[in-house]
């Protein structure tokens, strides 16, 4: 009778065993897919931020060259804001996605960029699309 009891236990416990095995397999597969999806999302988001910062940097360096020889007081104010923008861009932590003030610093750069554009009296339109990213005026 003890042998038949073991057979019934195996049958009764099969549901629990299969449930546990299914959970483990599903968890492992879900973890693997989650890592891949997270990496894809992080890469895309990081590329967008990098493209935006790079665009600001190129814009700032171009205007630095253009304003370098100007000596009016108005241009002096533009140069101060421009130097501040360039400094913020250069201090931005490109290689540390865990930096706790990353988005705060990015917002400050965006604000300084808007301030500089206002001084220049230009209306930038930053776009990220499948064809690439860039500024238009």
UniProtKB/Swiss-Prot annotation:
Keyword terms of this UniProt record: Acetylation, Nucleus, Phosphoprotein
PTM annotation (N-acetylalanine): residues: 2
An example Gene Ontology CC term for this record: nucleus
Residue positions where Phosphoserine is found in the record: 4
GO biological process, one term: protein maturation
Primary localisation category: nucleus
Subcellular localization, as worded in the UniProt entry: Nucleus
Chain intervals for the UniProt region annotation (deca-GX3 motif): 22-58
Any further remark recorded for this protein: Amplified and overexpressed in oral cancer cells.
Assigned protein family: Belongs to the LTO1 family.
Complex formation: Forms a complex with YAE1. Interacts with PYCR1 and PYCR2.
Protein name (record): Protein LTO1 homolog
UniProt gene name: LTO1
């Amino acid at each position: 009778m003890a042998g038949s009891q073991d057979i019934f236990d195996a049958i009764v416990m099969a549901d629990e065993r299969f449930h546990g095995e299914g959970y483990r397999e599903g968890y492992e597969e879900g973890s693997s897919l989650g890592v891949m999806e997270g990496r894809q999302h992080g890469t895309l988001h990081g590329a967008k931020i990098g493209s935006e910062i790079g665009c600001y940097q190129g814009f700032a360096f171009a205007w630095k060259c253009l304003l370098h020889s100007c000596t009016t007081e108005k241009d002096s104010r533009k140069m101060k804001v421009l130097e501040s923008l360039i400094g913020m861009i250069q201090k931005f932590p490109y290689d540390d996605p865990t930096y706790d003030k990353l988005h705060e610093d990015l917002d400050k750069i965006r604000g300084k960029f808007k301030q500089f554009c206002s001084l220049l009296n230009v209306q930038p339109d930053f776009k990220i699309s499948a064809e690439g990213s860039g500024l238009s005026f």
